[in-house]
């Protein structure tokens, strides 16, 4: 692994990432926590030197798994590029609420829209999205039956809807 990371071409690093990710995806359902940690370490190192489209593909392939390498999922969810982050933010149920809250406070609309589209969105997250999101984020949130709203959040949504005919 060290040799490939230091001297391997970008294509070789990408192929190695794809192969290791493929092994993980193939066996994820029967791996124990320690094995997942090993995959996490290896995959993180491999993702540090590959193209965005490879990271986006990896994010899409991991998003629906019940057991995802924790640090890798965290890094993908918080990636600068919303296309990389969105599959994990929208569909991965393994991302802790605290991470989602941090991301909702720090990131822009692409990330916020993905969080707004989750199957379940807590009241705290909903309030953050209502405070920080643009109209496209609020539309996603308004159409999400899994978004739990406080009374203050509902009032913010009504105010936003009065200003936005599309909502």
Indicate where each model-derived feature is located:
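Alpha-helical scaffold segments
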Residues: 1-167
